[in-house]
Amino acid sequence: MFSWSYLMGLVMVATATLSLARPSYNIAEDTTLEPEDANSSGDDEDDNDGSEDFTNDNNHMRAPYWTNTEKLEKKLHAVPAANTVKFRCPAGGNPTPSMRWLKNGKEFKQEHRIGGFKVRSQHFSLIMESVVPSDEGNYTCIMENEYGSINHTYHLDVVERSPHRPILQAGLPANTTTKVGGDAEFVCKVYSDAQPHIQWIRHFELNGSKIGPDGHPYLKVLKAAGVNTTDKEIEVLYVRNVSFEDAGEYTCLAGNSTGISYHTAWLTVLPDEERELDSSSEYTEIAIYCVGGFLITCMIGTIMVCHMKGRGKKSDFSSPPAVHKLSKSLPLRRQVTVSADSSSSMNSNTPLVRITTRLSSNNDTHLLAGVSEYELPEDPKWEYPREKLTLGKPLGEGCFGQVVMAEAVGIDKDRPKDAATVAVKMLKDDATEKDLSDLVSEMEMMKMIGKHKNIINLLGACTQDGPLYVIVEYASKGNLREYLRTRRPPGMEYSFDINRIPEEQMTFKDLVSCTYQLARGMEYLASQKCIHRDLAARNVLVTETNVMKIADFGLARDINNIDYYKKTTNGRLPVKWMAPEALFDRVYTHQSDVWSFGVLMWEIFTLGGSPYPGIPVEELFKLLKEGHRMDKPGNCTNELYTMMTDCWRAVPSQRPTFKQLVEDLDRILTQTTNEEYLDLNNPLEQYSPSYPDTRSSCSSGDDSVFSPDAMPYDPCLPKSQHTNGTIKT
């Protein structure tokens, strides 16, 4: 690792005059390291020196021997997680020796590793892609023929990339000098593994002071990343037509889920010499205009004062605008400082938020005495008049708040007099400061992501003169899981009520359309650099017109301090929807969302079936590591099932992207007719080992994720065991 960093450092020095390069310790995500040669990918390319591996004496028999001992000298190898590793044991002998590998003294088999490995006997090499911490250990190659054997052991250490705050290139932004009327440019280079949020900030004075009462400087946000802003655009700040008022201190501020970094530069403004050389006649003319303008201004001012006195004392609207202050107490979010510390790990592009508390100093608890005691900056684009909102019945509760139905008059700009049904998110009475921070973060995230037909969209917010209300779209048909279950045909095996007539009869095209809509929603979220982390049917809502909308994508979840194997106070983790790399190594990417999308497809084509029913969590871990996957649902075509299994590939890079899924589903949907109703004779099946289900009762805990009472009821479905090694649900 040291030699690699050292080489990169030399390259940077050599090219410093030509371009700006990344620091040597920032290794790209898709870099492939080979223990003995970092210049080769070690994956799909043949070895340049492969001839060494085939040394063979045709004249006499010989026991195995090493053909290149230099490649065996380095025994200890440390590589970053997610890279590809190749171990080589170049050997010769007559007859050509066979090769086998041991890990920690035991035979190394494909099923011992998620994603397996490659063995190239021709080059005597072992290749492992996307290594994770569980791959650490001793790897021994044994070369043998009938005349003897030799062996060599490598030790592999997988180095997890420790999260770090953004790194700003030294010397940038640089101090700049320009003349009045000219243009100034500041450049800021930001390096960060997690997606950074970048802001340009201007320091200014208020009431003659640059520092506020709390000791923090007064700041004004000049430029921030938006939905359609590229990294290159946000890294450059232009100040056009500079005046003396523009002189001062400018800061480039970058924050991610780990922390914040900032560099400051000064803008110096010089007078325009050409303008100073104007003739005296021009100065005289200017002076005349100034005196005349001053006299006119005084007259107008006198008239206005007299008029105001006649109308009586009016309300004072001259209070200074809200300002944003730099806080070191927690990871920066958009326009927000939270007085209490927070260790939450936000999404990589979590927006920056500012909250100013007025709680009295003698309040020792973290509970909010009243949400109205918190001041939130007003966003005119999204602010909705509180008096036009009429709250209705509760719709449900979440981990930090509750949701109620409401009527909002004029929230649709095209129909200002009409009332629309909406859903309103608000805090509970016992909400904490962190709960408020989370709700504001979710609101700001939804602002950043923008609108799409297949996600729950933000409609507005009430942030002033009362508790925080976040207004979102209302989906009248509830979550997708219950929507599908209530539409199971009466004759379908394990329907809730065989005498019940379903509200609507589902066709095969309905299910494909549902899947296609959700793929489009996830494609949009991925394009906005949003990782969902909890994609499942329970987190999809259905509107009155059967439009599928992904929900809870803006929720900032804490993933640093979670026990993946035990029930927590917030319920169960969605282990049955989580990709192996997220489950075992806490690696969350768009490709881990693709895995969850495959499970969501399985839920759809089983009409709300529960994944892996009857399988304990510990057994599920073992099955996933061994490469087992759920069987094809009865109402699913081979092509769609292949799409599911592609989403469940062990190596994340081998899974399809959401863009590819949208294209494939669009094609399938176009070819599907409307008359294909569900075949009631097809049972719903899934993989399960052929052992009896020993649970004494059915629990909603199998599907409840963040709240033990996520469902009002979860009827126990009868199970038919030992039917071709499967369990039906």
Curated annotation (Swiss-Prot):
<feature type="glycosylation site" description="N-linked (GlcNAc...) asparagine">
    <location>
        <position position="207"/>
    </location>
</feature>
<keyword id="KW-0832">Ubl conjugation</keyword>
<keyword id="KW-1003">Cell membrane</keyword>
<feature type="domain" description="Protein kinase">
    <location>
        <begin position="389"/>
        <end position="678"/>
    </location>
</feature>
<dbReference type="InterPro" id="IPR036179">
    <property type="entry name" value="Ig-like_dom_sf"/>
</dbReference>
<dbReference type="Pfam" id="PF07679">
    <property type="entry name" value="I-set"/>
</dbReference>
<dbReference type="GO" id="GO:0017134">
    <property type="term" value="F:fibroblast growth factor binding"/>
</dbReference>
<feature type="binding site">
    <location>
        <begin position="473"/>
        <end position="475"/>
    </location>
    <ligand>
        <name>ATP</name>
    </ligand>
</feature>
<dbReference type="GO" id="GO:0005007">
    <property type="term" value="F:fibroblast growth factor receptor activity"/>
</dbReference>
<keyword id="KW-0067">ATP-binding</keyword>
<comment type="function">
    <text>Tyrosine-protein kinase that acts as a cell-surface receptor for fibroblast growth factors and plays an essential role in the regulation of cell proliferation, differentiation, migration and apoptosis, and in the regulation of embryonic development. Required for normal embryonic patterning, limb bud development, lung morphogenesis, osteogenesis and skin development. Plays an essential role in the regulation of osteoblast differentiation, proliferation and apoptosis, and is required for normal skeleton development.</text>
</comment>
<feature type="glycosylation site" description="N-linked (GlcNAc...) asparagine">
    <location>
        <position position="228"/>
    </location>
</feature>
<comment type="similarity">
    <text>Belongs to the protein kinase superfamily. Tyr protein kinase family. Fibroblast growth factor receptor subfamily.</text>
</comment>
<comment type="subunit">
    <text>Monomer. Homodimer after ligand binding.</text>
</comment>
<feature type="binding site">
    <location>
        <position position="425"/>
    </location>
    <ligand>
        <name>ATP</name>
    </ligand>
</feature>
<keyword id="KW-0053">Apoptosis</keyword>
<dbReference type="GO" id="GO:0043235">
    <property type="term" value="C:receptor complex"/>
</dbReference>
<keyword id="KW-1015">Disulfide bond</keyword>
<keyword id="KW-0597">Phosphoprotein</keyword>
<feature type="modified residue" description="Phosphotyrosine; by autocatalysis">
    <location>
        <position position="564"/>
    </location>
</feature>
<dbReference type="InterPro" id="IPR013098">
    <property type="entry name" value="Ig_I-set"/>
</dbReference>
<keyword id="KW-0393">Immunoglobulin domain</keyword>
<feature type="disulfide bond">
    <location>
        <begin position="89"/>
        <end position="141"/>
    </location>
</feature>
<keyword id="KW-0325">Glycoprotein</keyword>
<feature type="domain" description="Ig-like C2-type 1">
    <location>
        <begin position="64"/>
        <end position="157"/>
    </location>
</feature>
<feature type="glycosylation site" description="N-linked (GlcNAc...) asparagine">
    <location>
        <position position="151"/>
    </location>
</feature>
<dbReference type="GO" id="GO:0005886">
    <property type="term" value="C:plasma membrane"/>
</dbReference>
<keyword id="KW-0732">Signal</keyword>
<dbReference type="InterPro" id="IPR013783">
    <property type="entry name" value="Ig-like_fold"/>
</dbReference>
<feature type="compositionally biased region" description="Low complexity">
    <location>
        <begin position="693"/>
        <end position="707"/>
    </location>
</feature>
<keyword id="KW-0472">Membrane</keyword>
<feature type="compositionally biased region" description="Acidic residues">
    <location>
        <begin position="31"/>
        <end position="55"/>
    </location>
</feature>
<feature type="modified residue" description="Phosphotyrosine; by autocatalysis">
    <location>
        <position position="565"/>
    </location>
</feature>
<keyword id="KW-0547">Nucleotide-binding</keyword>
<dbReference type="InterPro" id="IPR003599">
    <property type="entry name" value="Ig_sub"/>
</dbReference>
<feature type="modified residue" description="Phosphotyrosine; by autocatalysis">
    <location>
        <position position="494"/>
    </location>
</feature>
<keyword id="KW-0812">Transmembrane</keyword>
<dbReference type="InterPro" id="IPR007110">
    <property type="entry name" value="Ig-like_dom"/>
</dbReference>
<feature type="transmembrane region" description="Helical">
    <location>
        <begin position="286"/>
        <end position="306"/>
    </location>
</feature>
<dbReference type="InterPro" id="IPR017441">
    <property type="entry name" value="Protein_kinase_ATP_BS"/>
</dbReference>
<feature type="glycosylation site" description="N-linked (GlcNAc...) asparagine">
    <location>
        <position position="138"/>
    </location>
</feature>
<feature type="glycosylation site" description="N-linked (GlcNAc...) asparagine">
    <location>
        <position position="256"/>
    </location>
</feature>
